[in-house]
Amino acid sequence: MKFELIANDGAARRGRLSFPRGTVETPAFMPVGTYGTVKAMTPEELEGIGAEIILGNTFHLMLRPGTEVIQLHGDLHDFMHWEKPILTDSGGFQVFSLADLRKITEEGVKFRSPVDGSEILLTPERSMDVQRALGSDIVMIFDECTPYPATEDQARESMELSLRWAARSKVAHGDSPSALFGIVQGGMYPALRSRSLEGLVDVGFDGYAIGGLSVGEGMEERHHVLDHLMPEMPAERPRYLMGVGKPEDIVEAVRRGVDMFDCVIPTRNARNGFLYTREGVMRIRNSRFRTDTGPIDESCDCYTCRNYSRAYLKHLDKCNEILGARLNTIHNLHYYQTLMRELRGAIAEGRLEAWVAEFYGRRSQAVPSVP
């Protein structure tokens, strides 16, 4: 992987990631394909809305169908018919989500499979092996996602364990051609975040992710962490904010220098009738759309908006038709890719803050301040 920084506008960055399987323009949003599919979307539709990289889930694919089935096809790209880059998470966040069903030790995490109840030990070495089998273009280290809320002592202990696992992940990754990203932990404590980043840089990674956010904290807490951490992150490496988020969350993180994002929000919300427009979120289940012949968003040129009315989408949703979920998802992911494209253009042209003012103005919201 090669990362090229093309332009800056304040702290915001316009860049490019280059892989043998293709290039990714940054800032970039990665649709989430948990089980080897971005829900309700074909790979061709993903390409059509402008996605250049997607995310796969190591934990879930390891459990079902298992790497042995995927490797019968080649790797995850072949299995799911996606020819562009794939980033896979390490499984750390999913293990964190199991809560009382897992036991963390120095070696790794023991847990009961949610599929068949068998006991599984997931270690940094095992995570690297699985991600290698998946053929990931970007591999994430195995870490412990610090719980929220956490005391400073709890956050420190968790962060230090993650640093030791990071070093083991690097050794296990070996000479794999895939990029390997470290993950900064440390909870809501700036000094611990700095220590985590320092330790990761000492080990040396191809990119650096910020983990342990979007786990229940408020926006002010998240921005406090980002405002402290972003100026310290290596400028020559890509920066990835994991699991974030809503359009306004992405805009604020881009203003602070983040390059990469992933989140299930656009696809999950699409299946639940929440649609993104330039003015904010539209609830298609609202009764006022029953006879509305207009598109979701007059300014949107996605397949859904070019061909279907709000009334039709409300009808499909009311009847629980699969097509409704598909059309809604096409629109929401198109909105996200358009958002990223506009952010890239604004940064490249040195007019990001003017674009941000327009973004919030259309939503009748004040522009948040950035240090």
From Swiss-Prot:
Annotated pathway, please?
A: tRNA modification; tRNA-queuosine biosynthesis
Task: State the superkingdom.
Answer: Bacteria
Q: Provide the cofactor note recorded for this chain's UniProt entry.
A: Binds 1 zinc ion per subunit.
Reactions catalysed, semicolon-separated, are: 7-aminomethyl-7-carbaguanine + guanosine(34) in tRNA = 7-aminomethyl-7-carbaguanosine(34) in tRNA + guanine
Give me the ranges of the annotated region RNA binding: 243-249, 267-271
- Active-site residues per Swiss-Prot or TrEMBL entry: 89 (proton acceptor), 262 (nucleophile)
Q: Which NCBIfam families match?
A: Q_tRNA_tgt (TIGR00430), tgt_general (TIGR00449)
What name has this protein been given in UniProt?
Queuine tRNA-ribosyltransferase
Give the originating organism.
Thioalkalivibrio sulfidiphilus (strain HL-EbGR7)
What's the name of its gene? tgt
